[in-house]
UniProtKB/Swiss-Prot annotation:
It comes from Rickettsia rickettsii (strain Sheila Smith). This is Small ribosomal subunit protein uS7. GO terms for molecular function: rRNA binding; structural constituent of ribosome; tRNA binding. One of the primary rRNA binding proteins, it binds directly to 16S rRNA where it nucleates assembly of the head domain of the 30S subunit. Is located at the subunit interface close to the decoding center, probably blocks exit of the E-site tRNA. Signal peptide: none annotated. Part of the 30S ribosomal subunit. Contacts proteins S9 and S11. GO terms for biological process: translation. GO terms for cellular component: small ribosomal subunit. Belongs to the universal ribosomal protein uS7 family. InterPro entries: Ribosomal_uS7, Ribosomal_uS7_bac/org-type, Ribosomal_uS7_CS, Ribosomal_uS7_dom, Ribosomal_uS7_dom_sf. Keywords: Ribonucleoprotein, Ribosomal protein, RNA-binding, rRNA-binding, tRNA-binding. Pfam families: Ribosomal_S7. PROSITE patterns: RIBOSOMAL_S7. HAMAP family: Ribosomal_uS7_B (MF_00480_B). The gene is rpsG.
Length: 160
């Protein structure tokens, strides 16, 4: 690992339809083997399904889902005196949204519907209403951080 300087953050262009960088990152996370057009088709079709089935603004539902699933705390493993401790740390905004999108995509892919479009639409709608597997994952992460609050003085970086 280089000690000279941190890697530059790549500039991600906003998506064409909603002009959102967050949605563009989400599409990039959906993408497999460089097939971005297919990933965009999946996401936009899921948005259409949300709009038709639940009669809500799909972009607003997406933003609510991402905000609801985004964790505020997580645990990091720190080695102190030969023992590993799970230390609760704050999650910065960029990592929080990255975790949220990953959890939503994983929860959607494990759903029972046949097509990814249906799976993603239902998971996004449920997450926007504070339900679903992705919300459970966030709550479990927060419970883990709360349970290990006693080790917060071992924090590897300053708590914000």
């Amino acid at each position: 690992m280089s000690r000279r300087h941190a890697a530059e953050k790549r500039v991600i262009l906003p998506d064409m339809k909603y002009n959102s960088i967050l949605l563009s990152r989400f599409i990039n996370n959906i993408m497999k083997e460089g097939k971005k057009a297919l990933a965009e088709k999946i996401v936009y079709s899921a948005f259409n399904k949300i709009e038709k089935k639940h009669r809500v603004d799909p972009y607003q539902a997406f933003n609510n889902a991402m905000h609801n699933v985004k964790p505020h705390l997580e645990v990091t493993s720190v080695r102190v005196g030969g023992a590993n401790y799970q230390v609760p740390t704050h999650v910065d905004e960029r990592r929080g949204y990255a975790l949220a999108s990953r959890w939503i995509i994983n929860a959607a892919s494990k759903r029972s519907e046949k097509m990814m479009i249906d799976k993603l639409a239902e998971e996004l709608f449920e997450a926007s209403n504070n339900r679903g597997v992705a919300i459970k994952k966030k709550e479990d992460t927060h419970k883990m951080a709360e349970a290990n609050k006693a080790f917060s003085h071992f924090s590897p970086k300053k708590m914000k």
